[in-house]
Amino acid sequence: MASLIYRQLLTNSYTVNLSDEIQEIGSTKTQNTTINPGPFAQTGYAPVNWGPGETNDSTTIEPVLDGPYQPTSFNPPVGYWMLLSPTAAGVIVEGTNNTDRWLATILIEPNVTSQQRTYTIFGVQEQITVENTSQTQWRFVDVSKTTQNGNYSQHGPLLSTPKLYAVMKYGGRIHTYSGQTPNATTGYYSATNYDSVNMTTFCDFYIIPRSEESKCTEYINNRLPPIQNTRNIVPLALSARNVISLKAQSNEDIVVSKTSLWKEMQYNRDITIRFKFANSIVKSGGLGYKWSEISFKPANYQYTYMRDGEEVTAHTTCSVNGMNDFSFNGGSLPTDFVISRYEVIKENSYVYIDYWDDSQAFRNMVYVRSLAANLNSVICTGGDYNFALPVGQWPYMTGGAVSLHSAGVTLSTQFTDFVSLNSLRFRFRLAVEEPSFAIMRTRVSGLYGLPAANPNNGREYYEIAGRFSLISLVPSNDNYQTPIANSVTVRQDLERQLGELREEFNALSQEIAMSQLIDLALLPLDMFSMFSGIKSTIDAAKSIATNVMKKFKKSSLASSVSTLTDSLSDAASSVSRGSSIRSVGSSVSAWTDVSTQITDVSSSVSSISTQTSTISRRLRLKEMATQTEGMNFDDISAAVLKTKIDKSIQISPNTLPDIVTEASEKFIPNRAYRVINNDEVLEAGTDGKFFAYRVDTFEEIPFDVQKFADLVTDSPVISAIIDFKTLKNLNDNYGIGKQQAFNLLRSDPRVLREFINQNNPIIRNRIEQLIMQCRL
C-alpha cells in the first residue's frame, strides 16, 4: 500500500499554493506601507471590547414550557396541553365541537357555601349551583352538556393549591385533571370530531407538548417554576408562535458589529451529530483461552446530511475519558478463561465528540465568544461479543447501556489526514441505563455501564440532534481567512531545533513499548495519517501538508520520480546476461555476496549482487506505482514516526516537515523487495542479497537475473516485510500452508496481526528488527 504522499509525487500532482509563493516572495522583499488599521490592530490578540450580540432563540428543540400567552380563541393542536393560569374566579375556558359536546371549566374561590351563581357560557347567561368547602384550596369544576339546548352537569372537580388547570385534545378525547393536589390525576371526555374543538380561554395560558406530560402534572400538583424573577413577564398574543421572522433562525448568519477590517458574526446552526465507538480487542498468547485487553479507542466518522435544503459534509471524532477497568479470572490453569482488563464507561466517565462541517461557521473559527449548544440525549446500548475458545462452550459478553447528556461545549482541533480543523468539542456526561451487562457462562452478571466489547451493537452510528450558536470575529472581507498566530512564525535556529528533535526522538525509543509500536505498525498507514493523532498543539497544521510536499520536491526520492521509467529500463538493460551469470546454480547460497566468486563478467556491472541492488534501489518507486494491497516498509516507518510525534514535546510546525522528509528517506535502510511469478518468488535487497524459491516447499532455485528484470518491469513489486530467511525459519519450526505463505509474501496486515496476537516469536522478532532500524 503506497503512501499517499508518494502517489501524488508519482503522478506529478504535487502543487504549491499561490499564497505560499506570495509568502516566500514577501519574505525576501520589504516595503513600508501606511494603512488605517482600525481598533483591532493594536495587539496580536483578539479584541476585548466585544459587542452585545444577539441571544438566539429557535424552535429546533421544542421547549418544555412555552408561554405565557394572552387570552384568545383558537383551535389548539392535537397532543398539546393548555396549562391555564387564572388570577380570578369565574369561567376560565370553554370549548365545543358544535355537535355533541359543550364543555366549560369554572374556578371557585375557597370557603364558598352552596349557592347559585350566574355565568356567561358560550354567550348565554346560565344559572349554576356551586360550592367550595375547602378553606385554602381553589376548586375547578367542569360543566358539560351534549346538546345545544340541554342542561349542564358538573364533573371531575379539582381542588388546587397552585391554582392551575390543564386541558388537551388527544386520541378522540378531551383530557383534563381531577382530584386534589398534590395528587391530581388526568381524566377525559369522549367527543366526536375532537380535533375540530375550538377553545376560548379567559386567562393567561402556557403550551406543553404531550411528551412532557409528567412536567405538566408536576406543575399542576406543585406550581410553575420561577421564570426570570428579576424581570416583568408580559404575556404574548398566541399569534406570536407563528411569527418566526421575529426570532433568530435555526440556521442564520447575523452581523453583530463591523469595522473597516473586522466584523463580528453570529452563527446559528442546526446540527446532526453522528458518531460511533471504536475498540481494540487483544488476545493473549498461549492456548487461546486468555484475552489481555478490551479497550475503547478514538473513532472518526465522516457523513453528509441535509440542513435547510443544503447538503452538509461533517466529520466527527468520538473519544472517551474516565474509563473503569474490570477483569475476570476464571482460574490459574492455562485452559481457564481470563480477561486481564476490559474497559467500561459509567456515570463517572465522559464522552467527547469533536464536530466539524464545511459550513461558513467553521471557516474562521479562531476568535470565538458566546459559544452555546443545546443537544438532545441518546442511549447507547451494547451488543454481544463471543470469546471463541478452542474447546467448550464460548462465554460471551452481552448487554450494558449508558445515556449521553450534554455537559458543555468548547473549541478543539481535529487532525485529519490532510489538515487540522478548528472544531467544536461537545462533552457528554453519562448515566447508566438498563439493561445491565454480563459475561454469560461465568459468574459475572448484573453490572452496569457500557463495556468496550461491542459498544455499537451492530449500528453504523449513533445520532444526536441539536443546535449551537457562537459569535466569531472574522475579517470584513469574506474572501480573507482569519490569520493563525503560528502561520507567520520566523524560522530561527532551525538546525538546532532539528538536532534537539532528533535526540528526543531517538531517546523516546527506550520509552515506547515495542508492543505499542507493533500494534500501530501493522495498521495500513498513509504518510499523512501520522497527523491524525498528534497531541501537540500545532495551529499551523493546515500548511504542514504543503510544506512536506515542498520538502519532498527537493528530496532524493522525488528527484528520481521524473526518470523512474528510464531508470528502470536502463537498470534492466544494463544487467549482464552472459552465460556465466545464468549458470550460477542453487549451490550458491542466497546469503553470500557472489561478487567474490564471479570474476569473469566483463560488464561494467561486476556481479549479480550489485546488479540486483541497482534494480532494488528503484523498486521502492516501482512498488508505489503498482499499488500492491499489502503493507510496505513506508507504512511501518510512518507508524513509528507517528508514535514518536505523539509523545514528543518539542514538535513545531517548522521542524515537522523536515522530520517527516528525513524519516521517509532514512527509516528502514535495509529493504528487500520481491516479485511473484506463479509459484516462484524472486527477491532482492538493497544490500545486494538475492534469492529465488518455490512457495509450496521454500526450496531455493537458481536466480534468473533476466527473468527478474523482466518481471520488475511488468509485475507488481511487493515489500518483503517477512523476508525469505524468516519465512523458511517459520516453515521449518511451525509449518505453514500455501495460502498462509502467499498472505505473508503479500504482507497482508491481517495475517501478520494474527501471528503477532498469537505471540509467534519468529514473526514478532522480524517486525521488531524493522522497527529498531527507525532512527533519525
Swiss-Prot record:
UniProt short sequence motif KID motif, positions renumbered to this chain: 644-646
Disulphide connectivity of cysteines: C203-C216, C318-C380
Region (Spike foot) location: 510-776
Cellular-component GO terms for this entry: host cell endoplasmic reticulum-Golgi intermediate compartment; host cell plasma membrane; host cell rough endoplasmic reticulum; host cytoskeleton; membrane; viral outer capsid
Stretches the record annotates as Spike body and stalk (antigen domain): 248-479
Coiled coil: 484-511
Keywords attached to this entry: Capsid protein, Coiled coil, Disulfide bond, Hemagglutinin, Host cell membrane, Host cytoplasm, Host cytoskeleton, Host endoplasmic reticulum, Host membrane, Host-virus interaction, Membrane, Outer capsid protein, Viral attachment to host cell, Viral penetration into host cytoplasm, Viral penetration via permeabilization of host membrane, Virion, Virus entry into host cell
Name this protein carries in UniProt: Outer capsid protein VP4
Species whose genome carries this gene: Rotavirus A (isolate RVA/Dog/United States/K9/1981/G3P5A[3])
Organism taxonomic ancestry: Viruses, Riboviria, Orthornavirae, Duplornaviricota, Resentoviricetes
